């Protein structure tokens, strides 16, 4: 079965891998997936990622982050927009995640940015996912 929502597939793979405490997870390469992983790395939710090819298809190996007691840095990661239901927000109505402890990832005219950056730059956009 073909994957129609690469972002949702990526979020599900990260969620499942962190729950069973895998060191890393392989994801399909796409520009939006890479942009989301850049934000997760900047915010400390993943250690980093590597891009590799397998039989002509590009993949990303995301290295997950855990604390000293092997608790995952990502407690919850949820998709907000789906292919069948896009959710948009202006910068004035940008929701807060876990009272400011989580992050919101937004696709805007400035690229893929966090909800805080969207408020600071006064741009709205499509709400991709929330992480805490």
Curated annotation (Swiss-Prot):
Alphabetical UniProt keywords: Ribonucleoprotein, Ribosomal protein, RNA-binding, rRNA-binding
Disulphide connectivity of cysteines: none
Gene Ontology MF terms in the entry: rRNA binding; structural constituent of ribosome
InterPro entries: Ribosomal_uS8, Ribosomal_uS8_CS, Ribosomal_uS8_sf
GO biological process: translation
Domain of life, source organism: Bacteria
Any one cellular-component term (Gene Ontology): ribonucleoprotein complex
Function summary: One of the primary rRNA binding proteins, it binds directly to 16S rRNA central domain where it helps coordinate assembly of the platform of the 30S subunit.
Assembly notes: Part of the 30S ribosomal subunit. Contacts proteins S5 and S12.
Similarity comment: Belongs to the universal ribosomal protein uS8 family.
Protein name: Small ribosomal subunit protein uS8
Organism: Borrelia hermsii (strain HS1 / DAH)
Classification lineage: Bacteria, Pseudomonadati, Spirochaetota, Spirochaetia, Spirochaetales
Gene this chain is encoded by: rpsH
